[in-house]
Curated annotation (Swiss-Prot):
It comes from the Eukaryota. One of its GO terms (biological process) is RNA splicing. It comes from Dictyostelium discoideum (Social amoeba). Residues 28-42 have a biased composition (Low complexity). SUPFAM superfamilies: Mago nashi protein. Belongs to the mago nashi family. This is Protein mago nashi homolog.
Length: 197
């Protein structure tokens, strides 16, 4: 069986839900950017058409060129529920690590909830620091009928965020990236029994 054909089933869809049906007060809300009314995250996900589900795309890249060459971490979720992961670190002569797996609909649904709950679709990167010699990070998301593409410098800590011209917006991206990286490292680690850097 190839890596592409492998499917990760972390839990049933009912176990993946953050909110319980018994307590509607726990439902998180996200502002629908296409209209002025506020909808729950679940309502927004329920209104997705099949084409919008197929068009969902998320890509994150962080990297720099330094003493060891071009070092980077990149992952993306593509149509067909594919997760592609690449980690290029030349430290101690390590080689490029590339992995590809298929994830369940429940995992993709949770990623969409994380995106909606973060509020990243409402942000703008015009006041964020430009990529520089420290490095570069990019976040691209296609979700429903919206497409965002952000580019900024590599951010090491919340201190870097606080020093920026848009600390609130950059903080949204910082925390979203931390959540996504934890999820991706867990998925890759669980599946391949490796320790992603």
């Amino acid at each position: 069986m190839s890596d592409v054909d492998t499917k990760i089933e972390l839990a049933t869809d009912s176990a993946m839900d953050i909110t319980s049906p018994e307590n509607d007060n726990n439902k998180t809300t996200a502002t629908a950017t296409s209209s002025s009314e506020t909808q729950t995250t679940e309502d927004i996900l329920k209104t997705e058409t099949q084409k919008q589900k197929d068009d969902f795309y998320l890509r994150y890249y962080v990297g720099h060129k330094g003493k060891y060459g071009h070092e980077f971490l990149e992952f993306e979720f593509r149509s067909g529920n594919k997760l592609r992961y690449a980690n290029n670190s030349h430290y101690k002569s390590e080689n490029l690590i590339r992995k590809e797996v298929c994830v369940s609909d429940g995992v993709i649904s949770e990623i969409k909830k994380v995106i909606l709950d973060s509020g990243i679709m409402l942000e703008d990167d015009k006041n964020w620091p430009e990529p520089d010699v420290v490095g570069k990070q990019e976040l691209e998301i296609v979700f429903k009928d919206e497409h965002i593409s952000f580019s900024t410098t590599k951010i090491g800590s919340l201190m870097d965020v606080e020093k920026s011209d848009d600390p609130e917006g950059l903080k949204v991206m910082f925390y979203l990236i931390q959540d996504l990286k934890c999820l991706v490292f867990s998925l890759i680690g669980l599946h391949f029994k490796i320790k992603p850097i």
